[in-house]
Curated annotation (Swiss-Prot):
GO terms for biological process: 'de novo' IMP biosynthetic process. InterPro entries: AICAR_Tfase_dup_dom_sf, Cytidine_deaminase-like, MGS-like_dom, MGS-like_dom_sf, PurH-like. Keywords: Acetylation, Hydrolase, Multifunctional enzyme, Purine biosynthesis, Transferase. This is Bifunctional purine biosynthesis protein PurH.
Length: 529
């Protein structure tokens, strides 16, 4: 049974006024009586709409600079009153039923994100009456529709037109879910902010006040259900943040291909985040969350050709990411050369999409352009807990490197060192990357000992016939022994970039000097587990 409820009276009180005038006009045109508060009421009146101020309805004025507006029995009784059960009480106290509540809340997140926001500013942007009305209406969804998203306005009017001015129970229930999600996210933001302010109240420094909150509340929205998880016996879904501030796999639009799998999304994220590190036209090919080929070039076609050469075997069935628009020539090269699961780029030309359309199973994603990297949090689930840390946005420039060996690197060695240092950040530890002329020539990933990662990188380069002599090597963490340097020298490496910091740094540097290798210290580690 649809259990339709007619909408005869609506209360509108919004902070974000986008679309509210048009929505109110549509409601009024359909005979809905409008109640409103403060700035919303003034806006509607200015537009010539018949609107009753809540203070006129309740007989009680707004007070305390707007802190008390809607906290009144005639408001909440009208929202919470059960039709057919509380009618006599409502009539006795002259409480009019309110059939729809349209509310969005004070902009707390935007307020605290502003530079120089004080605790007092934040406190004044904590909405009290709004969430109370939202929760009241959502609780009584059997009789009342609660609208918290402007994106729902058009659909609501259409349903009212299709149902003689009424909304179905299914719609009211769906709106109630959105309402509770809305207030949960809002309260979570406030709790996180206040939790991070605790040290300041204890007289600690401003730096201490920026620590993680003592309770972490997270809100993500389901974007899609997956066929299965990492393995076919695991169920899975993909959730995203509500307001993602940076182009990412979460914001990407799929323009063709089969539905993305759990592993597709994880691997695409790894590829895209790596390619973002480069200003020049770049290509990153990823397999099982590890780069297997990375290059920069004069064009993305040049970059792709060179990245593919690193490890054609592993590139089969991989994920390919670019930091420039996918063009027809590059699309044709990929489709003609290899099987690929996903291609992601900021955009794709019409000609490129015509070419990829010949391979309908290939997933093509466009994510838009990105600017500076946005600070945020990384999470790692452990059984019974959650590890939280800042995103690893650390990187070094040439001026920050320390040459610790007798020999200085050549200009090309230095360029290659900085290039493979960027790549190593995205390779699972222990990570070793060989690079020459702005392309990877060997990658050793995920080994339990660093020396074996170095050996594997050399083996991969040899297997593909790539010349290691004169190349640079990056290590995501320090070398605990000289054996990694000996392995690199045996392969032909002439420059090493690494964090330094081992108790055996002197032995490692001495080994580099013995082999005539230039060594650079970054004083920054890039573990990736």
């Amino acid at each position: 049974m649809q259990q339709r409820r007619p909408v005869r009276r609506a209360l509108l009180s919004v902070s974000d006024k986008a679309g509210i005038v048009e929505f109110a006009q549509a409601l009024s045109a359909r005979g809905v009586e409008l109640l409103s508060t403060g700035g919303t009421a003034r806006l509607l009146a200015e537009k010539g709409l018949p609107v009753t101020e809540v203070s006129d309805y309740t007989g009680f004025p707004e007070m305390m600079d707007g802190r008390v507006k809607t906290l009144h029995p005639k408001v909440h009784g009208g929202i919470l009153g059960r039709r057919g059960q509380d009618d006599a009480i409502m009539e006795e106290h002259q409480i009019q039923p309110i059939d729809m509540v349209v509310v969005n809340l004070y902009p707390f997140a935007q307020t605290v994100a502003r530079e120089g926001c004080s605790l007092e500013d934040a406190v004044e942007n904590i909405d009290i009456g709004g969430p109370t009305m939202v929760r009241s209406a959502a609780k009584n969804h059997k009789d009342v529709a609660i609208v918290v998203k402007s994106s729902d306005y058009d659909a609501i009017i259409k349903e009212m037109d299709d149902n003689e001015g009424s909304l179905t129970l299914a719609t009211r229930f769906d709106l109630a879910i959105k309402a509770f999600e809305h207030t949960a996210a809002y309260d979570s933001m406030i709790a996180n902010y206040f939790g991070s302010m605790v040290p300041a109240y204890h007289g600690e420094s401003k730096e201490a006040a920026g620590r993680f909150p003592r309770t972490l509340n997270l809100n993500f929205i389901k974007k899609q259900d997956m066929r299965y998880g990492e393995n076919s016996h695991q169920q899975a879904a993909f959730y995203i943040e509500e307001n993602v501030k940076e182009a990412s796999v979460a914001t990407a639009t799929q323009v063709q291909g089969k539905a993305l799998s759990y592993n597709n999304i994880a691997d695409t994220d790894a590829a895209l985040e790596c390619v973002k590190e480069f200003a020049e036209p770049a290509c990153v090919i990823v397999k099982h969350a590890n780069p297997c080929g990375v290059a920069i070039g004069n064009s993305i076609l040049d970059a792709y050709d060179r990245a593919y050469k690193t490890d054609p075997t592993s590139a089969f069935g991989g994920i390919i990411a670019f930091n420039r628009e996918l063009d027809a020539e590059t699309a044709q090269a990929i489709i003609s050369r290899q099987f690929v699961e996903v291609i992601i780029a900021p955009s794709a030309s019409e000609e490129a999409l015509k070419i990829t359309a010949a391979k309908q199973n290939v997933r093509v994603l466009t994510c838009g352009q990105w600017g500076e990297r946005v600070p945020g949090l990384d999470f790692k689930r452990v059984n019974g807990g959650l590890l939280v840390q800042d995103r690893d946005l650390g990187m070094v420039g040439a001026e920050e490197l320390r040459v610790v060996t007798k020999r200085q690197p050549t200009e090309q060695e230095l360029r290659d060192a900085l290039f493979c240092w960027k790549v190593a950040k995205f390779v699972k530890s222990n990570a070793i990357v060989y690079a020459k002329n702005n392309m990877t020539i060997g990658i050793g990933a995920g080994q339990m000992s660093r020396v074996y990662s170095a050996k594997i990188a050399g083996i991969k380069a040899a297997d593909e016939g790539l010349e290691v002599k004169g190349s640079s090597m990056a290590s995501d963490a320090f070398f605990p022994f000289r054996d990694g340097i000996d392995a690199a020298a045996a392969a032909g490496v002439t420059c090493v970039i690494q964090p330094g910091g081992s108790i055996r740094d002197d032995e490692v540097i001495a080994a580099a000097d013995e082999h005539g290798i230039a060594m650079l210290f970054t004083d920054m580690r890039h573990f990736r587990h």
